[in-house]
Structures are given as C-alpha cells and as structure tokens.
C-alpha cells in the first residue's frame, strides 16, 4: 500500500487468529488449497511445500481450512486472494461493483477468522460461557489442539 492510499478509517487487511510473523520463502500457487489441490501438487508435479509460502484463492472451502492444509503440508505462510472471476461477475468497472452492485471492487479485501473452532462461540471458552472470570484455554492450548493456525496468513486484494 502506498502512503497516499492510507486513510485513518481504513481497516487494514488481516486474518484473525493467525500469528504475527515476518517470513521469506518461495511463493507457490495452490489453487483453493484443498487437500486434493495440495495432493495434486505433490503427486503429479513433485512439489514439496515445506518452507514455501502458499498463495490460495478464496472459495470452495473455509479460509481456516486452507491455512491448516498448507500448514500440514509444511508451508510457512499463506497469502489469500479474491479472484475477480469469483467476486466481480459483471466485471471490475466501477458501475459493476459495490456500491452500484453487490460485487467486490478491485480495492476490496476479504477479511475473517482462520481459527477452526472446537465448538461454536469464543474459541478460548469452547462449550462454556465466555464471561468474566471464566476458565479460558490459552492460545498455546488452542494451537496444540489444532484450533488456531501456527503459520501466518495474509489476505490481499
């Protein structure tokens, strides 16, 4: 982002529940990062994702599963992007995107959580109320249980 593009009311893009990190590695396009996509890369193309940064399209499966699948395949991070063909079906011209239609403009970025909840509600209090003084699992507990990603993920426009 250029400094001139910043705005005090702009919410910077992030994926909730991923750890903060600065990583470097080779970038690999992994389609939707489904298990079958990653299997095809490994089996058909001999691609090992260990130490790689995966670039995945939004869609088909939950973003948290994309991150978990890449993590399980040995990746060190994930970049998630919206394919204009999926989110701007009429084209990306101003008259074809929000606020004139329901479709995401090119400057739009999907945001959301990447945790895979053990149960509905607050991930740190699965199965019981999230009230003051209630017992809570730690982020480390949630990572050990597979509910929170261990690798960073970043959405882009």
Language-model region placement:
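Noncatalytic luminal/extracellular "stalk/propeptide" segments of secretory-pathway proteins
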Residues: 1-53, 58-60, 82-85, 96-129
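Generic recognition of flexible, low-complexity loop/linker segments
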Residues: 16-17, 41-44, 65-68, 140-141, ...
């Amino acid at each position: 982002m250029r400094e001139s593009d910043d705005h005090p009311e702009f919410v910077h893009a992030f994926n909730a529940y991923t750890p903060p990190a600065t990583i470097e590695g080779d970038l690999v396009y992994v389609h939707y990062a489904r298990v079958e996509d990653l299997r095809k890369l490994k089996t058909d193309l001999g691609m090992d994702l260990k130490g790689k940064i995966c670039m995945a399209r939004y869609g088909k499966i939950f973003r948290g599963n994309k991150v978990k699948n890449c993590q399980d395949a040995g990746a060190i991070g994930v970049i998630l992007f919206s394919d204009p063909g999926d989110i701007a079906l009429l084209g990306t011209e101003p008259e074809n995107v929000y606020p004139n239609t329901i479709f995401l403009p090119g400057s739009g970025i999907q945001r959301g959580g990447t945790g895979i909840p053990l149960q509905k509600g607050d991930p740190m209090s699965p199965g019981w109320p999230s009230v003051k003084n209630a017992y809570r699992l730690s982020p480390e507990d949630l990572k050990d249980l597979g509910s929170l990603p261990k690798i960073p993920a970043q959405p882009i426009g």
